[in-house]
């Protein structure tokens, strides 16, 4: 999982990326290709 300050560019890497908010943190998840997972930090 990548940890980035800004997720805007990471969201555009794949069309199936979804932005989710869990416990105050923002994540990008991708069920088809999990290597695109990321968290804002």
From Swiss-Prot:
Keyword field: Ribonucleoprotein, Ribosomal protein
Keyword Ribosomal protein attributed: yes
InterPro entries recorded: Ribosomal_bL36, Ribosomal_bL36_sp, Ribosomal_L36_bact
Keyword Ribonucleoprotein: yes
Gene Ontology annotations for the cellular component aspect, listed alphabetically: ribonucleoprotein complex; ribosome
GO biological process per UniProt: translation
One MF annotation (Gene Ontology) recorded for this entry: structural constituent of ribosome
Protein family (similarity comment): Belongs to the bacterial ribosomal protein bL36 family.
Protein name: Large ribosomal subunit protein bL36
Organism: Rhizobium etli (strain ATCC 51251 / DSM 11541 / JCM 21823 / NBRC 15573 / CFN 42)
